[in-house]
Amino acid sequence: MMAYLVQTIATKFIFLILIFSLTKAAISLPFVVFLGIGETCQSMEEFIQILEKDSGNHGHCIMLGDNVEVSVLVPIMDQVTLACQKVKELDELKNGYNLIGISQVKNFISVGGPQAGVAGAPNCSFPICARLTNLLNLLPVYSTFIQASVAPSNYIKIPTEIDAYLKGCKFLPYANNEIPSARNPIYKKRFSRLHNLVLIMFEEETIITPRESSWFGYYPDGSTNVILPFNETQLYKEDLIGLKALHEAGKVTFKKAPGEHVNLSDTLYEIISPFLKDESSTQKIAVA
């Protein structure tokens, strides 16, 4: 999963991440929305306005250059760096939004995020993504060239090519602590400090395959015949990133939203909005 990277959170494949932080200040904090692949601030304007109205907090939209191209062409780790730089430039966030201090993060909400990966090239329709998707279908997805040139390749996990995935994929296996020799205990420690993890899956999802990846479910290694629920995966059983610890502590919430990938329905707003509202005078919110 990419979730534990919330301390330096960035855009990922067509989904939004909402992070909430704690502070001793008694004023409301602004929130930040990072865009997914092919999205622009203009396309998400209504979404942000509704959240602003419901939460009473000001929202910021973060674009990484021409987001349509950057989200597809720039490796995810580089997007992380760009996103952090953008946030640091916003004076309004200096006292209430911390991308580095994971201890300040309270709730993590993933809206249709491919937490366990995707089994193949994304089914996207806008021109540049469609062309690159065709490229992914023609060339080795774990080659150095593709991994450095096509961002979605960084979280493609082909169940029948696990060895190649672990050796060649430049983001997801590191993010999910799947490589035994490269596991980082800090990722697990920080992710385990979350107060709540909210995972939203779209019921008619076709962009992310399998759609259960939004709930950390995935195919077993070597097969696409069945989909394992989150608690039967290696990531959960070995608690590679702290998901099991959060679940056993009652801190994981699974939600379904109607429609296709990131369908901005009333149901989606109803799921998200309560987490954007203050629960006490000492709890404030930042969203990424």
Task: Cite the ranges covered by each PLM segment.
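Catalytic nucleophile-loop/oxyanion-hole region of alpha/beta-hydrolase
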Residues: 68-80
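C-terminal catalytic-base region of ester-bond hydrolases, centering on the histidine
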Residues: 184-288
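Short, surface-exposed "cap/lid" segments of acyl-processing enzymes
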Residues: 24-66
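Extracellular/periplasmic catalytic domains that process cell-envelope and extracellular macromolecules
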Residues: 25-26, 91-94, 102, 190-193, ...
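Serine-dependent carboxylesterase/thioesterase catalytic core
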Residues: 29-31, 35, 77-167, 207
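Solvent-exposed loop/turn segments at secondary-structure junctions
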Residues: 37-39, 66-68, 104, 113-117, ...
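Serine-hydrolase catalytic core
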Residues: 147-211
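Cleavable N-terminal signal peptides of Sec/SRP-targeted secreted and luminal proteins
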Residues: 3-28
